[in-house]
Amino acid sequence: MGYLKDHGFPSAAPVADRAGATLGRIAGKPAALIEFLPGMSVKRPTLDQLRGAGEGLAWLHLAAAGFDSHRHNNLGQAHWAQMFDPLHAAADDLKPGLSATILADLATLAAHWPSGLPTGSVHADFFPDNVFFKGDAFVAAIDFYFACDDFLAYDVAVALNAWCFEPDGSFNLTAASAFLTGYQSRRPLSAAEKDALPVLAHGAAMRFFLSRLQDWKPVEPGQLVKPHNPLEFERKLAVHREGVHLFARDPARA
């Protein structure tokens, strides 16, 4: 976060103590002080906010281009089959027959996953609640817990899943076009990246389905943190699986 701020991106930087350390302990637990950021997240973004979010993600990718620390994506495509191994019964409990469908998806993704795309530091969780606006203007991104190295276009695909689906589960092509227009105003996607977006978006939906399925359990009385329902991303998987031709109407080329 400090690197991004030093390179012009609006990120909250950790505050150093008198000795220059940014990580300390409070009550025996690791702790850090982080700068305050202005702005607010939105639940129903406007088209201008979608364009701003897309531009903000490209800004992040460009600002992080020289970052020389690296972190493997432990929730990336190479790990999905292993993540699903202990979850077959949980998938079928969620929806009868779902395990076989997910196995078929995993095989398809493994067979068609791209290689050689531009790689760099990615946010990997660029959801609306991690992005701040003032009015329609993008002003900051937060929550870099999952930040890692991966295809830059995979980060775009994560965002398309997060920002461009309607509450009824349908994919909003107009929203996707706005997001991608904003992104490409700062960092144009290559032809290979555009061609890979459908499979990357399918894979991004798989990543969040699997992590949510891992965490899914009944909410205990008084529990403050409620797990996210994996069915949201099961429905997104179905869109990518059955309606990939709709996504492939290529809003990236608009």
Per-segment meaning from a language model:
Residues 189-201:
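All-alpha amphipathic helical-bundle segments outside canonical DNA-binding/catalytic cores
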